[in-house]
Amino acid sequence: MLRVYLTPKERFRQAGGSRLKAAFSGRPLYQEIVNRAKRAGLVNAVAHHTHYGFSNHGHVQVREVEGMNSELTMCVEMIGPKATLEDFCRAHGDLLTDKVMVYKHLERWKLGMTAPGRAELTEADVSTIEDLDSE
């Protein structure tokens, strides 16, 4: 699993596009990251907005009652094998440069009933897309 931290106000800029144009016409960067993750074949990509917190030793921020606080850090979480996530980062450095990114090792857990009232938990490391497929 890879988490990329950014703010909702960050915009996607086309190559050669200006910041001013991106600020008024570009879509949010988190949407572009999720869209590219889908095209790259990752298993899951979700943008999580936060409600309360701080980043980089800054001030505590709160989500506004009427809408979103554009300064409050959010996270795009992507799930896939480590090698696939590494390839994604290399291929999309234009979106991810200077972002805080955190990789976490994944295990797939399966819970099955072995007898009435008795559950068995099995764990398996995730190293391929097939390891994540649902049954």
What are these regions (language model features)?
Residues 1-135:
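Positively charged, small/polar-rich N-terminal and surface patches that mediate targeting and assembly
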